[in-house]
From Swiss-Prot:
Residues 153-163 have a biased composition (Basic residues). The gene is RPP25L. Signal peptide: none annotated. It comes from Homo sapiens (Human). This is Ribonuclease P protein subunit p25-like protein. It is found in: Nucleus. One of its GO terms (biological process) is tRNA 5'-leader removal. Keywords: Nucleus. It holds the Pfam family Alba.
Amino acid sequence: MEHYRKAGSVELPAPSPMPQLPPDTLEMRVRDGSKIRNLLGLALGRLEGGSARHVVFSGSGRAAGKAVSCAEIVKRRVPGLHQLTKLRFLQTEDSWVPASPDTGLDPLTVRRHVPAVWVLLSRDPLDPNECGYQPPGAPPGLGSMPSSSCGPRSRRRARDTRS
């Protein structure tokens, strides 16, 4: 790839993993260059001011961690929020062009699967049986687990323990 330079990157559209959201939900699309201070200022202002009852932080790739951090900070500052977290992979299409046009190389298009996260914080109760639900006040990682399976499990095959 040393003979190519990146021309652009486009995130391919994908359906939201939370289609049942009320229309007045505040959606915070976190990007890699987003300032946490700015994101929190808007989200906390709306939640504490009472103009929003739900907020969704979404981020993909390197911004996924920043989206989770924003949600955790909001949960600390606004007590009693219910949380629903969804994880998916999104497709990203990268365009690469030859570094010098006289090399005879063709432009390339590469599709990558990048991790993405959506974190819904709500003042209203959410379905506790939905996969990814965490009740208010629960420590991270200790959300209620529904009795049924939450989706596909790892596709890894069991290790062969024979010597």
